[in-house]
Amino acid sequence: MGKEIVESAILSSVLVLVGLAVGFLLLKVQGE
């Protein structure tokens, strides 16, 4: 039970990090 919660938390945090990285790259590309 606890393992599933940990895995979903890790997945969501990874998705958030990926989203932030993509957004940052898009802003950087648009700024140039």
From Swiss-Prot:
A GO CC annotation given for this chain: cytochrome b6f complex
Main location: plastid
Transmembrane segment boundaries: 9-29
Membrane topology classification: Single-pass membrane protein
Gene Ontology biological-process entries: photosynthesis
Function as written in the Swiss-Prot or TrEMBL entry: Component of the cytochrome b6-f complex, which mediates electron transfer between photosystem II (PSII) and photosystem I (PSI), cyclic electron flow around PSI, and state transitions.
Protein name, entry field: Cytochrome b6-f complex subunit 7
Organism: Porphyra purpurea (Red seaweed)
Lineage: Eukaryota, Rhodophyta, Bangiophyceae, Bangiales, Bangiaceae
